[in-house]
Amino acid sequence: MARFAGVDIPNEKRIVISLTYVFGVGLQTSKKVLAAAGVSEDIRTKDLTSDQEDAIRRELDGLKLEGDLRREVSLNIKRLMEIGSYRGMRHRRGLPTRGQNTKNNARTRKGPAKSIAGKKK
């Protein structure tokens, strides 16, 4: 198994798909990295030469990935909560932050329904 940015990526898949297993690398970023490294998108991960692996690693080193990216996202959310912005308040209360209605739905964000004693329609 090849290892990029501390993540084992699958051998049998095409390299363009395998790179998306790294947090912070989607399909478009994967295509850009491979183009800059001069590696074909159709090659399988197991068929990469060591030179090609090194070229891909050099391109990935310039990106913010895995732990650094996760840390930045969590710090951004923490900053929103500290400054008391609307989005920060929604994060603090565990509600959707992007304007969705919460009267009937939003169960993923709010958690399981809490029954209210004596409430009947």
Curated annotation (Swiss-Prot):
Located at the top of the head of the 30S subunit, it contacts several helices of the 16S rRNA. In the 70S ribosome it contacts the 23S rRNA (bridge B1a) and protein L5 of the 50S subunit (bridge B1b), connecting the 2 subunits; these bridges are implicated in subunit movement. Contacts the tRNAs in the A and P-sites. It comes from the Bacteria. GO terms for cellular component: cytosol; small ribosomal subunit. GO terms for biological process: translation. Keywords: Ribonucleoprotein, Ribosomal protein, RNA-binding, rRNA-binding, tRNA-binding. Part of the 30S ribosomal subunit. Forms a loose heterodimer with protein S19. Forms two bridges to the 50S subunit in the 70S ribosome. SUPFAM superfamilies: S13-like H2TH domain. It holds the Pfam family Ribosomal_S13. This is Small ribosomal subunit protein uS13. It comes from Lactococcus lactis subsp. cremoris (strain MG1363). The keyword Ribonucleoprotein applies.
